[in-house]
A protein has these predicted regions:
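Residue-identity detector for glutamine
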Residues: 7-12, 40, 75, 87-88, ...
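A structural signal for well-ordered alpha-helices, especially hydrophobic packing surfaces
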Residues: 30, 92, 96-99, 117-124
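Generic alpha-helical propensity signal that fires on short helical segments
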Residues: 24-29, 37, 69, 77-80, ...
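Interdomain hinge/lid region at the active-site interface
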Residues: 45-113
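Internal alpha-helical scaffold of NAD(P)-dependent oxidoreductase catalytic cores
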Residues: 1-61
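Juxtamembrane/interface motifs at transmembrane-helix termini
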Residues: 38-41, 101-105, 126-128
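Short, amphipathic C-terminal "tail helix"
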Residues: 108-129
Length: 129
């Protein structure tokens, strides 16, 4: 693991399962759900696939992961994954509420999220523009 740049962490198994459900398994499910949503729209209007961007491709990259392996991981960690899905559902509901509010509320919510991401993943100079 060290040869690949990984930093080993010691923690209780239950904590590990909760955290990777949120940071690894949930992103996989979100990528899958995004592809499924566009596919569903594509059934009515195949032109939707002509409009997907590199952002869509990047965001959904993990949806191309090994299904058998991920299915096993999801089944093994079912309860932590369900909890992560609930947490994500609440985050989406908060964004939906911000969207229903005024422009300032939406911008404030998105700015706070952007700041959190940049705090954990500082942008490269070109990304800051």
């Amino acid at each position: 693991a060290l040869a690949t740049g990984a930093q080993p962490l010691q923690m209780q198994p239950e904590r590990h399962d909760r955290l990777v459900a949120l940071t690894s398994h949930l992103p996989y499910l979100l990528a899958c759900s995004l592809v499924a949503a566009v596919e569903q729209r594509g059934n009515d209007d195949p032109g939707v696939w002509d409009l997907v961007s590199t952002g869509f491709r990047d965001t959904t990259r993990v949806a191309a992961s090994d299904v058998r392996m991920l299915s096993d991981i999801l089944q093994t960690n079912r309860e932590p994954v369900r909890a992560a899905l609930g947490q994500q559902r609440r985050a989406l509901e908060a964004l939906e509420a911000a969207l229903d509010g005024d422009a300032d509320s939406l911008q404030a919510a998105l700015s706070a999220i952007r700041a959190t991401r940049q705090r954990h993943f500082p942008p490269a100079p070109a990304e800051n523009e």
